[in-house]
Amino acid sequence: MTLALDIPLNDTQFSAQRKSEVLVEALPWIRRFQGRTVVVKYGGNAMVDPGLQQAFADDIVFMASVGIRPIVVHGGGPQINAMLAESATPVEFRNGLRVTSPEVMEVVRMVLVGQVGRQLVNRINAYAPLAAGMSGEDSGLLSARKSRVIVDGEQIDMGLVGDIVDVNIDLVISMLDRGQIPVIAPVSPEVDAAGRPTGQVLNVNADTAATAIAQALRAEKLVMLTNVAGIYGTWPDPHTLISEVSASDLRAMIPRLGEGMRPKAQALLDAIDGGVSSAAIVDGRIEHALLLEIFTTRGVGTMARSDDYV
């Protein structure tokens, strides 16, 4: 039997002890997720703050190093807005929503693939050549169809905006099997009702793209980085932050949530309904939020789980 002695520790020893406790807490979660696929939506402040960018890259490399199969799907809203302003690209708004014209689409494509994706790949590959940047256009990775946006009962044409209708899972799985980390920009080729390419490219929301990819792969977990701490029962009361919820409880809860919380809650529920074991919204403003969510018992945001999740 080992006795724990009450020995006073200096600052260095205390810090070392805390680090060892973190590693011990992580061990069962490392074993649980080893060999499993985790899809991460990269967005919010984590994309624009250099310190948070590096922390996110560190987290992804750590996940891969312990045998997890991460996939990153990234947005780029702040960078796209900055480039549109800098290039003086004409932008039209309908009912407060930005229309993706062909001119805007060119900026979206350039920023997501050539800027945001490349920067993240470079940060990850500073450790080892692990990450491969790509878009939905590459090798038929994603197929999309134009979105139907309804505002106040009226259908609004938002231009070149789409929803994912198909994922080339064989391509993604082959990359994961080779030890690669796919870093995906969700610009995707449009297909018609018969699945034939139209020659047009659509801008797809990163949240919905990440959810579609996680569903297609039946991922173990989907994690979405945002600029909020999670889902609140009563926004913005911090005491009502929901740490964990079953799919059935979340389904019953959604009609009672505030308008700002409902889309986030619905995104988690959609992932679970599509076969993902658990889905979480975490605060991307916290350094290493991804590791805290995956490798600690309490996590750091709101996790929704299937009703039979163990």
UniProtKB/Swiss-Prot annotation:
Catalytic activity of the protein: N-acetyl-L-glutamate + ATP = N-acetyl-L-glutamyl 5-phosphate + ADP
GO MF term list: acetylglutamate kinase activity; ATP binding
UniProt keyword list: Amino-acid biosynthesis, Arginine biosynthesis, ATP-binding, Cytoplasm, Kinase, Nucleotide-binding, Transferase
Binding site for substrate: G76, G77, R98, N203
Marked site (Transition state stabilizer) residue numbers: K41, K264
GO biological process: arginine biosynthetic process via ornithine; L-arginine biosynthetic process
Protein name: Acetylglutamate kinase
Organism: Cutibacterium acnes (strain DSM 16379 / KPA171202)
Originating gene: argB
